[in-house]
UniProtKB/Swiss-Prot annotation:
It is found in: Cytoplasm. Catalyzes the reversible conversion of 3-phosphohydroxypyruvate to phosphoserine and of 3-hydroxy-2-oxo-4-phosphonooxybutanoate to phosphohydroxythreonine. Gene3D superfamilies: Aspartate Aminotransferase, domain 1, Type I PLP-dependent aspartate aminotransferase-like (Major domain). It holds the Pfam family Aminotran_5. This is Phosphoserine aminotransferase. GO terms for biological process: L-serine biosynthetic process; pyridoxine biosynthetic process. It comes from the Bacteria. One of its GO terms (molecular function) is pyridoxal phosphate binding. Its EC number is 2.6.1.52. L-glutamate binds at residues 9, 42. Binds 1 pyridoxal phosphate per subunit.
């Protein structure tokens, strides 16, 4: 079978080594004669999987001991509701920074539970889309927390600054598309959440990192399935968890540790992004409209100078083994998602194709 590189924004490409191990263990896991999908989540075998996954995840991000790691359901959209329901306490407002599609989606959901103080951080710099630096973000005095999205998959916008708003500001962040791709200082956040389907594992699992002093404040109307304290008290097994996604995510964590951890991923991700943006910037045939300071290293949207060639580009790239390059309907054009599992070889194959496509059609 020819080599396929999957540039999907999520569910995204998984490491080949992880898929191979899962394939080998699919019907006989741990010598039990059954699949990991068939064993009890409360049995000692799966409990070991869960405990190792949490330990490895903590190691990868250096999660401080006063933070809890929860393995939840509901994806990022579930957390759009869970954050206000768990963190508001007796306050009625929260600060939300709008820098793109997913931040706006979080704001829309939050309006069901509080009065968001929305700061629009989107700006245009020299005709390119950008985000105001954190020092210019206007926060309110009475907010329960401040929420933002460090990486906008659709817009191709990243906010790589580390929050520094003082110890009294609880920062909540949607890291779904950038978790584990670069080192972060977890202690600067109150809540970090991430859907698994981009840099962690299969869809269906959501990881929440929450500072323990924020537990026990859930709104009385908060559904139990979204209550951080309930999940913490039950070892993330309040109900039957997505066991296969948990198991496979655990394999990804071990793969990351075996390949240099988050620091090494950071270096490789920088190389991949520089290679792809380099081809775009050195061409009049392709363009990206995000200011360099805010370009995402995970999701690279780009347009062809002649949109009439879009269909042909997608057909020929697919035939070349470069899949899922169609841009989101909101932005159009193309989008290459190059998460941790995408090897440098895959980005090189894409850029080689782009150069050749331009030679033939430019």
């Amino acid at each position: 079978m020819a080599q396929i590189f999957n540039f999907s924004s999520g569910p995204a490409m998984l490491p080949a080594e992880v898929l191979k191990q899962a394939q080998q263990e699919l019907r006989d896991w741990n010598g039990l004669g059954t699949s990991v999908m068939e064993v009890s989540h409360r049995g000692k075998e799966f409990i070991q999987v869960a405990e190792e996954a949490e330990k490895d995840f903590r190691d990868l991000l250096n999660v401080p001991s006063n933070y809890k790691v929860l393995f939840c359901h509901g994806g990022g959209r579930g957390q759009f509701a869970a954050v206000p329901l768990n963190i508001l306490g007796d306050k009625t407002t929260a600060d939300y920074v709008d820098a793109g599609y997913w931040a706006a989606s979080a704001i829309k959901e939050a309006k069901k539970y509080c009065t968001p103080n929305v700061f629009d951080a989107k700006v245009t710099v020299d005709g390119l889309r950008a985000v105001k630096p954190m020092r210019e973000w206007q926060l309110s005095d009475n907010a329960a927390y401040m929420h933002y999205c460090p990486n906008e998959t659709i817009d191709g916008i990243a906010i790589d600054e580390t929050p520094d708003f003082g110890k009294d500001v609880v920062v909540a962040a949607d890291f779904s598309s950038t978790i584990l791709s670069r080192p972060i200082d977890v202690s600067r956040y109150g809540v970090i959440y991430a859907g698994a389907q981009k840099n962690i594992g299969p869809a269906g699992l959501t990881i929440v990192i929450v500072r323990e002093d924020l537990l026990g404040k859930a709104n009385i109307a908060c559904p139990s399935i979204l209550d951080y304290s309930i999940f913490n008290d039950n070892g993330s097994m309040f109900n039957t968890p997505p066991t296969f996604a948990w198991y496979l995510s655990g394999l990804v964590f071990k793969w990351l540790k075996a390949n240099g951890g988050v620091a090494e991923m950071d270096k490789i991700n920088q190389q991949k992004a520089e290679l792809l943006y380099g081809v775009i910037d050195n061409s009049d045939f392709y363009r990206n409209d995000v200011a360099k300071a805010n370009r995402s290293r995970m999701n690279v949207p780009f347009q062809l100078a002649d949109s009439a060639l879009d269909k042909l580009f997608l057909e020929e790239s697919f035939a070349a083994g470069l899949h899922a390059l169609k841009g989101h309907r909101v932005v159009g054009g193309m989008r290459a998602s190059i998460y941790n599992a995408m090897p440098l070889e895959g980005v090189k194959a894409l850029t080689d194709f782009m150069v050749e496509f331009e030679r033939r059609h430019g």
